[in-house]
From Swiss-Prot:
The lineage of its organism: Bacteria, Pseudomonadati, Chlamydiota, Chlamydiia, Chlamydiales. Activates KDO (a required 8-carbon sugar) for incorporation into bacterial lipopolysaccharide in Gram-negative bacteria. One of its GO terms (cellular component) is cytosol. InterPro entries: Cytidylyl_trans, KdsB, Nucleotide-diphossugar_trans. The keyword DNA-binding does not apply. Pathway: Nucleotide-sugar biosynthesis; CMP-3-deoxy-D-manno-octulosonate biosynthesis; CMP-3-deoxy-D-manno-octulosonate from 3-deoxy-D-manno-octulosonate and CTP: step 1/1; Bacterial outer membrane biogenesis; lipopolysaccharide biosynthesis. GO terms for biological process: CMP-keto-3-deoxy-D-manno-octulosonic acid biosynthetic process; lipopolysaccharide biosynthetic process. This is 3-deoxy-manno-octulosonate cytidylyltransferase. It comes from Chlamydia trachomatis serovar D (strain ATCC VR-885 / DSM 19411 / UW-3/Cx). It is an enzyme of class 2 (transferase). It is found in: Cytoplasm. SUPFAM superfamilies: Nucleotide-diphospho-sugar transferases.
Length: 254
């Protein structure tokens, strides 16, 4: 695993079997390929990463990733969330890493340009501890549902708040609303700090762990993207939506 030792920009795809909403989700088939394989192959197309690896504590997922030719690392079962799984892999296997991208395994339609944009934004903003992506939306369902996280940020691209509520509230002046895309780029040193930040009142209220960063006064910058992602997979019925989306993309390319 020479790439592990020398990689400076690393993409980690945490993958777990026991999703309460969709057990076994990583191995669900989408037009003949599993969710984890599609997510992994998308990440491999990034121009900015030196190495991409799946991190899992499940032998079935590990065996499958190895079978399709991907890189995979087994992690401990004590990780409380995907970010802790990412940090464990980086601290153990990537001594030279400088930038770490946490790639969500439920975004099979994520464009690799999103990953490249995250890395570029982090490199170009020395004050940023971490970077995440957002995209503008006018979809009323996405705006109103608490399953989609919204974000507001300042003129310099620094996040002010994340919420499951519709923010900002357009009471008197129409303002763009941005949906959060759950992909993060960290400086390695800050990632080690991040996993040690205790839950905060706002992070518990919203059930959004990134709010811990804002509550202690650290900075999250945002990278605004357009048309760079499709439907995500949260429930079994989302598989059909993703397949329809991919088929439409395939037809449009001809």
């Amino acid at each position: 695993m020479f790439a592990f030792l020398t990689s400076k920009k690393v993409g980690i795809l945490p993958s777990r079997w026991g999703s309460s909403r969709f057990p076994g989700k990583p191995l669900a088939k989408i037009l003949g390929k599993t969710l984890v394989q599609r997510s992994y192959e998308n990440a491999l197309s990034s121009q900015s990463l030196d190495c991409v690896v799946v991190a899992t504590d499940d032998q079935r997922i590990f065996d499958h990733v190895v079978e399709f030719g991907g890189l995979c690392v087994m992690t401990s079962t004590s990780c409380a969330n995907g970010t802790e799984r990412v940090e464990e892999v980086v601290s153990r296997h990537f001594p030279q890493a400088e930038i770490v991208v946490n790639i969500q395994g439920d975004e099979p339609c994520l464009s690799p340009t999103v990953i490249d944009g995250l890395v570029s934004t982090l490199e170009n903003n020395p004050a940023a501890d971490m970077v995440t992506s957002v995209t503008e939306t006018t979809d009323p369902e996405a705006i109103l549902t608490d399953h989609k996280v919204k974000c507001v940020f300042d003129k310099n691209g620094k996040a002010l708040y994340f919420s499951r509520s519709a923010i900002p509230h357009n009471f008197k002046h129409p303002t763009p609303i941005y949906l959060h895309i759950g992909v993060y780029a960290f400086r390695k040193a800050f990632l080690s700090e991040y996993v040690k930040i205790p839950p905060s009142s706002l992070s518990l209220a919203e059930d959004l762990e990134q709010l811990r960063v804002l509550e202690i006064g650290r900075s999250i910058y945002v990278h605004v993207v357009q048309n760079a992602t499709g439907p995500s997979v949260d429930y079994p019925e989302d598989i059909t939506k993703v397949e329809q989306y991919l088929l439409c993309l395939s037809k449009a390319s001809f």
